Every structure is written in C-alpha cells, then in structure tokens.
C-alpha cells in the first residue's frame, strides 16, 4: 500500500484552499502535479548545468550532455526498450504520434488501411486522417461493446489490407484498458505495424514494450509527474532506421554540403535543434520518483480508489457513467454526466466545493458522438488522491444535485 499522506507532502500545490475549500485535484488525465524532487531537478539544471548538449567541450556542456543522455537511459529502463537508440525525446504524445503517421505516409498506398478505434484521442485520429488523405489509404474504425473495445469487430476488420494499427492503451474518457498484447499479436499476424498511445497508461502501470512486442509507443511527461513539453517516442530500431527525419536543422546532421546533407545515427537523427534538456532531466527524475513508489503499487492504489468510488457514484440518482462496468478493465478515469446539467456547469459547481474535474469533449469528439452526448465531466485519479477525495467528489455531486433539483 502507498503511504499517500507522505506522497502528498511531496506535492506542495495540493496544500491550498480553493473557494474556501481544501483542493481536491481530480484532473490527472489532463495533467498531473509535480513533486518537489522534479521541480528541484529542473532548477538545479538551470542553476548549475545550463548549456547546450552534444556541442561543447566545456564543463557545463559535458555535464548537461551526460545528464541528458542519462535521462534517455532512465526512460529506456522504465519501458524496457532494447536500446537507447529506440528512445526519442519529443514534445509529447501528440508529436510522437504525428511522427509515426508521417512515417506511414512513406509506406501507405491506395487500397491500404489504417485501423484505429472510436475511443481515440484526437492526437491519434487526425494524424492518421492526414496520412490517409495524402496516400489514398482508408481509415477504418473499431467500435465498442458494453463500453469497451469490441474485439469481434477488431478481428473482423484486421485483414491483410491493414498496414498500421494505432490504439490507445487506456482511454482518456472511458477509462478502459485495452488488451494491447493480444491486439499486437493479431496485428502482427497480418503484417501490420502496431502503434500504441500510452499517454494514459504509462503513468499508471508497468510498461514493457518488449513483452508487449510494440512497434511504436508514445507517451508524455506531464501526465506522469514530469514537466510539460517533453515526451517520448519508442520505436523498434528496424523501423526507426527506415523512418525519415521529420524535422531538420542543427544537432541531427552528420555533415552538410551545399546541395545535400547526411544524418546522425539513432536516436539523434530525429532530435533537430536544441532539445528540451531540462524537460528530459525532469522526466527522468519523475520516473525515478515513480519507480521508488513502484508501478505495481501505483496501479493497485488507483484500482482501490476506483473500486471504492465507483459504486458510490452509481448510487447517485441521475448520474450516468460512461465505459465498461467491469472495474478490472478500468484505469483511474471516470467520465459522467448528471441529468441534463451541462458538464461545464457541473464542473463549475464542483469547483465551488474545491473539486477540480475536467469538462468538455476531452479531445475525443468521435467517441462522444458515438455515445450520443455532446460532452461530459471527468474525474481522474493519481498517486496523491485518497478515499477522502473520493468522498468529497461524491458529496459535492450530491450538493450539486440538490442545488439544481427539479431543473433536470
């Protein structure tokens, strides 16, 4: 079990009053808060080692380069990549998925298909729309059954026409965790390249890209107690060798002639310009922090919170929860609506009680269209949340229901 009270002391932002109430932060699927150790690591870099990497031979540059590449090795171990050549630093999951879709444009042709699901974040939809538009390939969707991915639908649509399968490991709306290992095996049987959006799984569970046999895996630092503006793209070396750089300029070149240029070896051929050194160091520090807690313990804690709060939410008359009712399939995300109350009004009412949740379409408009709802509220949990936070959410929802009684 986690010592949550000790963990909370590492996050000073949580110790504040919002609208005369103690803050209950339940918007972790959007971004997580940062522990002091991460803030100190970033400050330490700027205070002591601020210099460009891979370029200078002076002491600060050497220290900065060593820290930056040590961060890459930390990430490699965290996801069990086979080599640091397979770990690329990006601006975040969105950038990572765009890079893979750009690679797909080099492979796809008319008559080919890309298979995604209706539960995807826009960042795992729009890049594929563009890739298909440019190449004449077809974008095919897998739909839902009982609030989870319809595996029968997936099997039926996973033919040899499919060249790429790109799915969320965990939905940022439904909270459902997809059986990625099984899906990857099915994708590889038809020769498809498997791409996984790990933005909502990497912060919450142990990831082993080799065990899952993923071809590409993307995630962001800010959703796992790390800084904003830093993310990771893991790719199997054989595909990264085939993949053309997406950005060009300093740092990624081997040699430049008047009419041509050659690239550095992996992973640096993809990292043009001055990288986010402080972000990489901050992310590696966040990884170290999470690993000291233990990713199995992180997952177990969130499962305990969901098991505690889910039936309490179900008991609220007029509250609709989206996604599978099988809690074994769920992560720490719960999307809901309360009667006909607009989710923005609901979120505002909860904020009056000090409870921070998300409201809107959660960058998943095709999913909400499929569910036939314009928007929803969403509560999402992390390592510093408690059962008391769950109780406060339920109590705030009951107060909101009573306040708006008779209006929905």
Regions found by a protein language model. Name each.
Residues 1-408:
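Pyridoxal 5′-phosphate
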């Amino acid at each position: 079990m986690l010592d949550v009270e000790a963990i909370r002391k590492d996050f000073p932002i949580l110790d504040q009053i919002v609208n005369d109430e103690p803050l209950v932060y339940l918007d972790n699927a959007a971004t997580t808060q940062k522990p002091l150790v991460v803030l100190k690591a970033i400050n330490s870099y700027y205070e002591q080692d601020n210099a460009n990497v891979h370029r200078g031979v002076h002491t600060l540059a050497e220290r900065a380069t060593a820290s930056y590449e040590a961060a890459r090795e930390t990430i490699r171990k965290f996801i069990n990549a086979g080599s640091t050549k397979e770990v690329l630093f990006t601006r975040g999951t969105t950038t990572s998925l765009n890079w893979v879709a750009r690679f797909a444009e080099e492979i796809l042709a008319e008559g080919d298909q890309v298979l995604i699901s209706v539960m995807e974040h826009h960042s795992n939809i729009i890049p594929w729309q563009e890739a298909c538009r440019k190449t004449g390939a077809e974008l095919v969707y897998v739909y839902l059954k009982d609030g989870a991915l319809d595996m029968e639908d997936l099997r039926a649509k996973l033919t040899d026409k499919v060249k790429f399968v790109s799915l969320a490991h965990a939905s940022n709306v439904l909270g459902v965790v997809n059986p990625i290992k099984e899906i990857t095996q099915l994708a590889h049987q038809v020769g498809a390249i498997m791409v996984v959006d790990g933005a909502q799984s990497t912060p919450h569970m142990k990831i082993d890209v080799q065990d899952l046999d993923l071809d590409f895996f993307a995630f962001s630092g800010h959703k796992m107690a790390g800084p904003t503006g830093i993310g990771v793209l893991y790719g199997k070396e054989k595909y990264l060798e085939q993949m053309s750089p997406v950005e060009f300029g300093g740092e990624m070149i081997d040699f430049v002639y008047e009419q041509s240029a050659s690239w550095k070896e992996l992973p640096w051929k993809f990292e043009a310009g001055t990288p986010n050194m402080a972000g990489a160091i901050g992310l590696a520090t966040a990884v170290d922090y999470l690993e000291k807690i233990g990713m199995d313990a992180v997952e177990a804690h969130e499962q305990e919170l969901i098991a505690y709060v889910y039936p309490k939410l179900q008991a609220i008359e007029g509250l609709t929860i989206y996604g599978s009712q099988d809690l074994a399939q769920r992560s720490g995300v719960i999307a809901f609506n309360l009667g006909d109350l607009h989710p923005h009004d609901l979120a505002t009412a909860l904020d009056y009680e000090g409870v921070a949740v998300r409201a809107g379409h959660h960058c998943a408009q095709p999913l909400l269209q499929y569910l036939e709802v314009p928007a929803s509220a969403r509560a999402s949990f992390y390592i510093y949340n408690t059962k008391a936070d769950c109780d406060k959410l339920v109590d705030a929802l009951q107060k909101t229901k009573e306040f708006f009684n008779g209006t929905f």
